[in-house]
């Protein structure tokens, strides 16, 4: 079995384990980093550790490395202040999740594995608020387009994609 195939297998096994038995946490940045550590510890020595270099992808610049910690504090403090979006009606919930998705996507705190970490964290957060989301029903290409648009300040498509998948 090739190294690349082995890496894919390890990621799938860890994601499956996380789905079966979610990591306990209080939906703070430490919890977010713990999910990354859990998902990628078999692949990267630096799993769960913040990147120290600036990143961009497909024309999108992510949070400067030196700003990750202060930005994360703002994002996760706001999440706590909003009571983790519990008790919100569907439309308001989707609006908040869309905003949270955008801000954590911009944060992009790790060198690799940001998307999988973000989806795993969001799944747990959404479930804790009494909703669910099935990522397998989300068109990956459409999500990527929506994410790129959202990075440019246009969140309509992302809100629609997430809104249709959250129930």
Regions found by a protein language model. Name each.
Residues 35-40, 97-104, 143, 147:
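Short alpha-helical scaffolding segments that buttress acidic/His motifs in well-ordered protein cores
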Residues 108-141:
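Short conserved catalytic/interaction loops centered on acidic-Pro-aromatic/His motifs
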Residues 43, 148-167:
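Acidic, carboxylate-rich catalytic segments that either coordinate divalent cations
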Residues 28, 32, 114, 118, ...:
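Hydrophobic (often cysteine-bearing) scaffold residues that line and stabilize catalytic clefts
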Residues 39-45, 105, 126, 130:
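Short alpha-helix boundary/capping elements
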Residues 64-108:
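Helix-hairpin-helix/helix-loop-helix acidic hairpins
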Residues 1-5, 9:
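Single conserved hydrophobic/aromatic residue that forms the stacking wall/gate
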Residues 29-79:
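A glycine-rich, hydrophobic loop/mini-helix early in the fold
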């Amino acid at each position: 079995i090739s190294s690349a195939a082995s890496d894919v297998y390890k990621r799938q096994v860890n994601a499956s384990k996380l789905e079966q038995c979610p990591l306990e946490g209080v939906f703070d940045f430490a919890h977010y980093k713990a999910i990354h550590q859990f998902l990628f510890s078999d692949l990267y020595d630096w799993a769960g550790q913040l990147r120290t270099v600036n990143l961009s992808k497909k024309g999108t610049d992510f949070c400067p490395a030196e700003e990750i910690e202060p930005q994360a504090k703002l994002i996760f403090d706001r999440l706590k202040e909003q009571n983790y979006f519990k008790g919100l009606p569907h439309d308001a919930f989707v609006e908040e999740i869309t905003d949270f998705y955008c801000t954590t996507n911009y944060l992009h705190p790790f060198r690799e594995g940001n998307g999988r970490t973000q989806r795993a964290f969001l799944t747990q957060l959404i479930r804790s608020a009494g909703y669910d989301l099935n990522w397998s029903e989300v068109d990956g290409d459409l999500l990527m387009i929506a994410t790129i648009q959202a990075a440019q300040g246009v969140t309509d498509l992302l809100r629609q994609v997430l809104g249709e998948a959250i129930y």
